């Protein structure tokens, strides 16, 4: 199962959530704003994984982020079999 960390108020996260909401056991969406436990899990990953270096340098949050089935962390929806939001 692929874990996805995000927030309802994030447009990119909402786009991802819409893709997975009916996919059953393939994905687990973790809303980091729902509980401090979820936020702490996200912050531990963000503070300790170099994949977030550019996000932090640019003032970006770093969501949605994906924990793939092999444990790899990614910020790329395509790595999780999903589509990225297209900016117009």
Question: Language model features by range: what are they?
Answer:
Residues 18-20, 44, 80-82:
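Short, glycine/charged-enriched secondary-structure capping and boundary segments
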Residues 67-88:
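Non-catalytic, surface beta->alpha helical segment in thiol-disulfide oxidoreductase systems
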Residues 1-32:
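Local sequence-structure signature of Cys/Sec-based thiol-disulfide redox active-site neighborhoods
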Residues 26-48:
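Thiol-based oxidoreductase modules, predominantly thioredoxin-like and allied folds used
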Residues 10, 35, 74:
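Surface-exposed, flexible loop/turn segments at secondary-structure boundaries
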Residues 14-16, 39, 76-78:
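Short glycine-/acidic-enriched loop or helix-start segments at secondary-structure transitions
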Residues 23-24, 46-51, 85-86:
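Short, low-complexity, polar/charged sequence segments that are solvent-exposed and flexible
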Residues 43-73:
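Short, structured active-site "lid" loops
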């Amino acid at each position: 199962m692929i874990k996805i960390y995000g927030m309802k108020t994030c447009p990119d996260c909402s786009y991802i959530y819409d893709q997975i909401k009916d996919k059953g056991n393939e994905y687990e969406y973790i809303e980091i704003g729902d509980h401090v436990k979820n936020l702490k899990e996200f912050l531990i990953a963000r503070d300790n994984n170099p994949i977030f270096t550019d996000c932090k340098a640019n003032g970006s949050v770093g969501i949605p982020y994906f924990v793939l089935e092999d444990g790899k962390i990614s910020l790329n929806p395509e790595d999780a079999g999903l589509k990225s939001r297209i900016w117009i």
